[in-house]
Amino acid sequence: MAALHPPKHETFDVPAGTNTDPKGFVRQVETYRTADFGLYMDRSADHKEFSRLESWLLPDFGLRVSIFHYRAGHERDQHLYLDIGEFTGPDNDGRWHAEDWYLDLIDRPGRGLELEDVDELLDAHAAWLLPVDRAEAAVHIATRTMVGAASHGNDVQAWLAAEGAELTWSPR
């Protein structure tokens, strides 16, 4: 179980070409791309387990869909990692913003989406760190996403494409 914490916030500063993570670290972004349905980001990562991070912020879905490019020896069987929360942008300065609402969905090939961190959501709500409307919205987003993926052969990208959000990724 993770330590109790308020919702994590992240900033995607498209004009500056930077991404400020929840800990306040500012990182250069190699690629930002906007679509009618969201914002794509591709950046290198100075992390011991992964070297690159690709993400789509999908405001209408309440999702951030990511691919972590893991380093040798740290590979995982997951394909996509989905954060649930509030994703907005662009603001008047061209920045996008993310507020993570604790719940995550893991997409592993050949299996249904796996819901994680329910305990974090409940603990945060009990500690008044996440209001009831956002906690409830997180559960609805997770449910809609899991049902949508299941209705498309456990393929979350196929479901998103059918809903008008066709995700494209770096060919790396």
Predicted regions and their residues:
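Short small/polar-residue motifs
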Residues: P22-E30, G62-F68, Y102-L103
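Cysteine/selenocysteine-centered motifs that mediate thiol-based redox chemistry or coordinate metal-sulfur cofactors
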Residues: I141-R172
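Compact, glycine/acidic-enriched structural inserts
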Residues: M1-P7, L113-E114, L121-D123, W128-T143
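Conserved, surface-exposed functional patches that form binding/active-site neighborhoods
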Residues: D77-L129
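Well-ordered beta-strand positions
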Residues: T31-T34, L57, I106-D107
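The feature represents the first ordered module of a protein
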Residues: L39-D93
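Charge-rich, low-complexity N-terminal segments
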Residues: M1-L53
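Low-complexity, flexible helical/coil segments
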Residues: H74-Q78, D119-L121, V139-T143, A150-N154
